[in-house]
Amino acid sequence: DSLRSAAANSLDWRVSKAVRAIRNDPGGVDNMDYLAEIAGMSRANFFRVFEASTGVTPRVFLNMIRVEQAVTVATGSDLSFGALSDRLGFSTQAHFTRFFRDHVGATPSNFRSVSRLGQETDFLRL
């Protein structure tokens, strides 16, 4: 949240265009040159301005959005992990599973199961 509020207050307009592209379609971002092009900047200048505006590199920001969306979908829907992997731009479901486990600490299926167990427990407390 702090990254989101800081970004909202101080983003260079060119970086804002790239951030919107990442948030709207993280699976469509296949390389950083694409984001630099959206921002209308050279790759080197884009990296410099992006990091100065957000505090992180474009790749780190993309990965943060991918984790955020993966967690949201894993806990709030029954979308298959293969479909989620495609939506987020991973070349294979195995790559997505490794990425998720490395960033979240559990496999997507284990995370979904535990989060749903928590939701059932919350319901029982009411």
Where would I find each of the regions flagged by the language model?
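Short acidic/polar alpha-helix capping motifs at helix-coil junctions
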Residues: A36, N45-R48
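N-terminal/domain-start segments enriched in small and hydrophobic, helix-friendly residues
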Residues: D1, N45, A94
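An amphipathic alpha-helical interaction segment
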Residues: D1-N24, Y34-E37
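Terminal helix-turn-helix DNA-binding modules in bacterial transcription factors
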Residues: R20, N24, V29-Y34, M41, ...
